Amino acid sequence: MSHASLVRRDRDRLLPADPTTRSVARALYERVADAPIISPHGHVPVEWLVEDRPFSDPASLLITHDHYVTRLLHASGVGLDELGVGGSAADPRQVWRRFAERWPLFAGTASGYWISESLQNVLDVTVPLSAATADEAYDRIADQLATPELRPRALFERFGIEVLATTDDPLDDLAGHAALAAEGAVGRVLPTFRPDRYLDPDAAGFAQNVERLVAETGSPGTFAGYLAALSLIHI
């Protein structure tokens, strides 16, 4: 079955609608468009860059591990187990089909925008995503992911990233960051302090996490010790 190709969208689509303002915005953008990327926040696991393995399949890359995507799909009636969330077994192709069937839900969302950008400009998918084109798009992406150009380090270089900040648990040993720095194969990959699981008493496992935090830092099991542990681990 043949399908109409994706329409390449206007290059100014994110700029202001007013013509005068748009021309100024375009001029400003063009001055920095080729500058390297300094990314102060992200969710790229450092292991991706350390191991530099090919991404396994389209679903795990774009759907299963993106909570913005899975939440919207779940709100439309798709079970989280059907999406492979939480370690549940799910066939990647079936996950992709569920996603493609509900692709119109993502119109006007940030997730829809960046997935569209990835499909067109990185993964070279040339058909509009839908239930009818799900398998065609899946196979195209799978073929692309098997190439050296789509491995993590190659993408790091392709995107012009100079600095990438990861999101890290305070008790992470940061061995991956040390290994990358020693190897020097990619730009700077820096850890950032993300103590969320130690700050929300309503979160699952909060008590156990705090106990581990104070134990790892040798702090007393008091509120003052808890604050001291957070301060010590941040340093």
Question: Model-found features: residue ranges?
Answer:
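Metal-cofactor-binding active-site regions of metalloenzymes
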Residues: 2-36, 42-232
